[in-house]
Amino acid sequence: MQNAKSRLQWVLDNAKEEELKDLVRLRLAGISLDEKKYDDAVRLLDTKHGESFDGLYADLKGDVLTSAGKVSEARAAYQVALDKLGKKGTYHSIVQMKLDALAEGK
């Protein structure tokens, strides 16, 4: 995992394309989630990014916050993700299921 992180960090430090940097931050945040480094993941996801990534960033932030036990913040993140994603499609349905699962676990 460390090798993947160092390679992704290199891309983040050297890439000129902002969309590529946005994607790399998303991947690094996922690794931080896997490592239970929730603050690092949130920091990456709170970084300014292209609008087209809003739904993806918010969804992963919801996952991070859920794992960190911050349920009300996770609900808010999932709601942002739903608002930013198209109303139809599988991904929208998955995020809706995550939000519904949090509501059931009150």
Region annotations inferred by a language model:
Residues M1-L56, K61:
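Alpha-helical adaptor scaffolds
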Residues R27, L56, L60, S67, ...:
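"A position-specific structural signal for the A-helix of alpha-solenoid helical repeats
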Residues K5, D22, V42, R75, ...:
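Conserved positions within tetratricopeptide repeat
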Residues L8, G62-D63, A68, A77-Y78:
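A broad helix-preferring feature
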Residues G50, V71-G89:
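TPR/TPR-like (Sel1-like) alpha-helical repeat modules
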